[in-house]
Each structure stands twice: as C-alpha cells, then as structure tokens.
Amino acid sequence: MFMGEFQHNIDSKGRLIVPARFREGLGDRFIVTKGLDNCLFVYPQHEWAEVEQKLKSLPFTRADARAFVRFFFSGATECEVDKQGRILLPNNLREYAKLDKETVVVGVSTRVEIWSKEEWDRYNAQAEASFEQLAENIVDLL
C-alpha cells in the first residue's frame, strides 16, 4: 500500500526522484500515465494489469468509454528507475501535469500520484475545506 506525501524537484533533464518508501512497492519498472485532476498516476505492473483489464471491459460502442480509454492509454509509458532512484518523465506527461520543478509525490493506496506543488496545494486546500462534506457524501459507498 502506498501512503504519504513527499516533495521532490524535477531536474533540468526531466528526472524525478521516486521516494525510497515507494520504490519497493513499484518495482524497477512501472507505468506512469495521465491521471485525473491534472496529476500523473503511477502503477506497479500488477496494478496496471488490473486497471487494463477493467478498462478493456468497457463497451467500445460508447463514445465516453472510448474517449477515456484513449486518453488514459495514450499517455501511458513504462518508466525504469535508475541507480540514483530517479525516473525520466516524458515531456508530454510533464506538460499535462504542469510539472516544472517542484513536485509532490503522493501515495494513494494502490497507486502513486505525481503533482506539481502548485496544483497539489490548490487541490489540497479545496479538499480540506470540504472534507466533512466529502465524508458525508461517500459514507453510503462504504
């Protein structure tokens, strides 16, 4: 399980340090793709396989399903951790998530998310302001 929040900088070559706490669960090779809320989703290979199976079961006759699957898979790339614990994030993913220098790497149960610090701070402030309401809304889902 992934949890916690870590701040790291992207270097001039587009490399990001993967927090040591997450490296063991992610393995040496894992998938990074466009996520929701302008962040990147990072999946270990076994979790990616499960997500892939679920998305493959969506009806391709529905335009919204096709659009989501296209968006999700077209942004996906396999990353490999180098000896310094870094990954190279492709330019298209850095642009999508507005990653420039300061980032926040967040553990979210079965995946990791990579956020620009500015976007994370904005998102987190909104979530904190409505946390009680969010809890009330999802209690029925549990």
Swiss-Prot record:
Disulfide bonds: none annotated. Its main location: cytoplasm. Residues 5-47, 76-119 form the SpoVT-AbrB domain. PROSITE patterns: SPOVT_ABRB. It is found in: Cytoplasm, Nucleoid. One of its GO terms (biological process) is negative regulation of DNA-templated transcription initiation. It comes from the Bacteria. GO terms for molecular function: DNA-binding transcription factor activity; transcription cis-regulatory region binding. Coiled coil: none annotated. Keywords: Cytoplasm, DNA-binding, Repeat, Transcription, Transcription regulation. GO terms for cellular component: cytoplasm; nucleoid. InterPro entries: MraZ, MraZ_C, MraZ_dom, MraZ_N, MraZ_sf, SpoVT-AbrB_dom, SpoVT-AbrB_sf. Signal peptide: none annotated. Belongs to the MraZ family. PANTHER family: TRANSCRIPTIONAL REGULATOR MRAZ. Forms oligomers. This is Transcriptional regulator MraZ.
